[in-house]
From Swiss-Prot:
Keywords: Early protein, Glycoprotein. The keyword Glycoprotein applies. Pfam families: Adeno_E3_CR1, Adeno_E3_CR2. This is Early E3 20.6 kDa glycoprotein. The lineage of its organism: Viruses, Varidnaviria, Bamfordvirae, Preplasmiviricota, Tectiliviricetes. InterPro entries: Adeno_E3_CR1, Adeno_E3_CR2.
Length: 187
């Protein structure tokens, strides 16, 4: 039973961490973590020992605007896991901090704009931006990864229970069939 519980916990943890976004930042830079598109986002920092804090309660180190979290002047102590939720959806981040002498990994930016930025007037650009933000909200029909991992863990646990009960029922017969074959007098 202990091995079943351990397997169940490891499976659910593997499912949870597979959906986590990994970000690599250098010391001294600023890092912005985007929150879910819903309402006001609450941010948590989770330490390796299980402790957690609210980074938005530390105004000198972090900046929160209601949705996004910005880590100001990243240090080696800022590495770890950050969790943002609006209690309808959530996002996980794993921050990996590199020394400032290590070059940051290359990032490629793609642009599909066919109009030069200086040809669009400010009101038109603001209207397009507002329409884009309104159209990019997440659907309420999507299922979060933590929900999927919980469902997977429960399904695995129930299947292990069914297997154990079936094994017990098939391998252990009633007492009248358990007799020693040398003491039977059936000829």
């Amino acid at each position: 039973m202990v091995s079943t519980t351990t397997f169940l916990m490891l499976t659910s943890l593997a499912t949870l961490t597979s959906a986590r976004s990994h970000l690599t930042v250098t010391i001294g830079s600023n890092c912005t973590l985007k929150g879910p598109q819903g309402g006001h986002v609450f941010w948590w920092r989770i330490y390796d020992n299980g402790w957690f804090t609210k980074p938005c309660d530390q105004p000198g180190r972090f900046f929160c605007n209601g949705r996004d979290l910005t880590i100001i002047n990243v240090t080696a102590n800022d590495k770890g896991f950050y969790y943002g939720t609006d209690y309808k959806s959530s996002l996980d981040y794993n921050i990996i901090v590199l020394p400032s002498t290590t070059p940051a990994p290359r990032t490629t930016t793609f642009s599909s704009s066919s109009v030069a930025n200086n040809t669009i007037s400010n009101p038109t650009f603001a209207a397009l931006l507002k329409r884009t933000v309104n159209n990019s909200t997440t659907s309420h029909t999507t299922i979060s990864t933590s929900t999927i991992s919980i469902i997977a863990a429960v399904t695995i646990g129930i299947s292990i229970l069914v297997f154990t009960i079936t094994y017990y029922a098939c391998c252990y017969r009633k007492d009248k069939h358990k007799g020693d074959p040398l003491l039977r007098f059936d000829i």
